[in-house]
Amino acid sequence: MERISQAARNMLADRLLPFWKALRDEENGGYYGYMDFDLNLDKKGEKGCILNSRILWFFSQAAMVLQDDSLIPYARHAYDFLREKCLDREYGGVFWSLTWDGKPLDDSKHTYNQAFAIYALSAYYRLTGEREALELARELFVLIEKKCTDKGGYLEAFSREFAPVSNEKLSENGVMAERTMNTLLHVFEGYAGLYQATNDPQVAGAMERILDIYAAKIYNPELHRQEVFFDRDYNSLIDLTSYGHDIESSWLIDWGTGLLGRAELTKKIAAIDSDLAGHILRTALQPDGSVVNECERGVVDEHRVWWVQAESVLGFVNAWEKHPERVEFREAAAWVWQYIQKKIVDSRPGGEWFWRLNSDGTPDREKPTVEPWKCPYHNGRMCLELIRRDPDVYV
């Protein structure tokens, strides 16, 4: 048995950091964007701007938490690509994706994507003090507030010129959503990162408005879950429980709310976050230590998805830190970590984590190792948060 923070250090040193360092594209900038299940790297695969932002965040945060200056050039490499290629200098905002050599591939603008750039740029600024990174983050904050909102909250998908378009990218399960829980969560996260870097009262005000929506519109107290997809008036479009997003929100919104330092607000949001974490513990945690993906109209999707496992470790640790008497949260965090080590980690030479496992426990060979959504953000952040928190958990 070892302390989970030490296990996290080992995971970073032995697997995550070497893997993502090796994807640096020295010739065309940024990081390679696609590797198939068999670990074949496609050097001409698309480069998702979300993936690049998440890599920038990962190396920036890792350099800070591990106090390892050797990681700064990897963060800078992602930063240069974001600044020079991902940003649209004509219309503002960040493109959805680029070609392998840095030309716009999908030039649409999505609120979710802008938020991740803010999150990454804020971390890079905190690491380096680079004023330009902070200015870019502030510009994207202003852009979201000006171009991606209406009186009810945040909208989702836009053309390059910021004309509204349909939200295919963040809609799933056969619905077309005008608002999503997922985008709201990550706008809050990006703003929290910017607030951590600036203590800007404007950013704090936007965060508080998001928390009002979270508490009043997203959270469903009767079902102990977040609703996922909405029309413009926040009517839920589908009976869906996203176990991964619920456990992620339970710690991430808790963290961001804590930055604001408002006692009453913290108390109100903490009650919601604890309810979400408890519901995942009761309904989604499996006897083998895994957490299933989601439940749509009463039917459970039993895939074990990489990011859901990572967020579950962190969500259960956070819930136990808030409620030390509830040792079942502490035990659950250890169980999920052990499941990750046994099943989700891809132990092949040059492997990282499998995208997901089928219900029979075999890796899904259709899912690649790297693609625009498969990134070091969830598993890397889990490790870095475990090191930062150093909870009394052994695995």
Give, region by region, the residue ranges found by the protein language model.
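Glycan-recognition and catalytic cores of secretory/periplasmic carbohydrate-active enzymes
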Residues: M1-V395
